[in-house]
Amino acid sequence: MRKPSRLLVLALLAIGIFQVTHAKEENEVDASGEGPPGTSADSAPGSAPGSTTEETKTEDDANVDKSCKDRHDLCKFWSSIGECNTNQNWMEDHCPVSCDVCNGVSTCIDRHRLCGFWATIRECETNAVWMLSNCPKACKACKGRSVTLGGTGPGGTFQEDDCTFITTNEDTSIRKTLSIRDVRDSNANFNCAPTQETPNCNRNLCYHLRYRSFDGTCNNLEKPMIGSAFTALMRLKKPLYDNGLNAPTSSFLRSRPSARDASRLLLSSSTQIQHHSNALLMQWGQFIAHDLAKTTMLNNQECAACTSNKGRCTSVFLSRSDPTFGRFMCLPVARSTPVCGTGVTNFREQFNENTAFIDGSMIYGSSDRDQFLFRQGAFLKTKLINNRVFPPVDKNNNVVAGDDRANIFVGLASLHVLYLRQHNRIAATLQRVNPHWDQERVFHESRKIVGAMIQRITFTEYLPKVLGVVFEERIGAYPGYDPNTDPSVANEFTSCAFRFGHGMIQEFYPFLNEKFQHIGGIPFNDGMFKSTHILNNGIDPLIRGLMTLPAKMPQRLTPAVTERIFGNSDLGSINIQRGRDHGVPPYTVWRKFCGLPEVKDFEDLKSVISNQIVIDNLKVVYKHVDAIDMYVGSLLEDPVKDALVGPTLACIIGEQFKRTRNGDRLWYENSKVFTGEQLVQIKKITMSRVLCDAGEHFPIVPRKAFSVFKPTASNLVKCDEIPDLDYNAWKEELAV
């Protein structure tokens, strides 16, 4: 078959021989075994298929390509005179489009990069058969029904078999979706966060079956809101507010000590105990934390005045004897924004701005209305600085990403840069592999692959080091998608348990050159909200430094975050106060929840805290064991073997990630998400491979990027020794 040519078509039409020549070309193809058996060039088209019987099929017919396209120029005519019924076997093999047997079997795609152009110059009408076979999408001839017509299910609902074409656009025209600006406006004007409307998943079923919505809706097709952005955090246990509805714990009843006293006397320490993982593991944890959740905060300007406004502030009042902050009245802490309508006649609930899924929402954002702040066509927006590719930067020279916390620390900003480059690298590769794909298709396929990479690295490289020997017990192997599992982020996970990573922050981070030699570094506090370090030097020196710096065990917090963070604040106090703000039940409740030995008095703590001095200090600060804050008690536990955290944190973290995975219909291991060959490729990915792909210049890398190592030749490998993905697994066949 020929490819359409506008000039050829016009010339042939001008001399009146277009149809004759076109038929002649097709009959020449027939002579090679492609046409109806037993026909000659001058056979009447109506009789050609009709003369074919099952017995006369040639051996070539048995090897005919089974992809869904017509293989003869006269297929449409033969189908019009009933040959699909009277000569069914041959016609369905050679004329499947004309016989309408593709629906539910194949995907409707354009098979040439010029299909769109040819359609605009009316090739769909003047060269209909070739175009309908090879450019059905451009010719608007895809099998299946449009949204406006409805599907083939009861009441016009869509079914999976209706989705024989690939749609890359989620139609949100009939429902109001939220943007970050909507949330900010509601927060400023009404002191609460709005939730979004429940969508009709069936309207965009063909999109949802293949791609994630930006806001996470319709991941679960029966319960479309679970796990979605702009919804309330779920709870594992009922909250304990001082007034039963909304007042922070210990704000009226004074049942617990000052959060500052608990942080200063129990958590703050300059002593460091090293782990066999490295500081890049800590940074990955923060990256993932921002993928899963972002709690909206009320405006804190009023809190700076140290008012006792319980509605907006939960500031930590200070003692004059505090050695660091004694000159201040309080550490200002704004309350988390409540979901509109909660906290009056029901429990106050907090808001998650991000999707609960590991989907790269910190890269791409969590709103379809915000997506173009970060993307341009198939690619993420970039800025070239010092001949290096970065995200766009704001007026303060900080990188702009899908999550506005990207610049909290320069190490986190480095991972945002790394994955922006990785997305764009994948998009460019997919464009080369499938030049007929449009920009939307390339973007969504690239986003899908990046999300799968993050999932894979988190579950195979990150979590086993966090949970140690209890990883299999708490998370285990993937059992498949469970629509009855709620993947939503638990309030107790994001407000307490997963904040353990703050204890891994260190005082100083080195920079290393390509030979892993020290060339400087930065104190932690100097790396906060200052992307200029990587804009000037690139991300490689800092990432090499993170990989060679042993991870700090998280059971204590360095003075960099308890005495000097944010100028005059204490991250330990903020974490404790945040748990109280959210009404999180005390530590002893979570021991029981996790099926661990209960703690009824301070003596019972000896089974999980080996240091008697720590237990004695707990007794002095808290007076009663049932008053111990979840964050404090669980953080102070001795770590599980080979783990970073103790048994209570391992339980809560494992519980969350297990639900995150099992309740995600678009999890990379779900057999419907990637083809078998694509999944084989996804499973090759490692953090080391990503560094090779998207770093500025990593000629050598450690094979295990999250394990601490000495930079010797025996511990480093060349990038070409690290398995890479073969993107030909995503290649779609094109017409010849």
Report residues per predicted region.
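Short amphipathic alpha-helical molecular recognition features
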Residues: 2, 67, 83-87, 107, ...
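Intrinsically disordered, low-complexity proline-rich tandem-repeat tracts
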Residues: 37, 44-45, 49
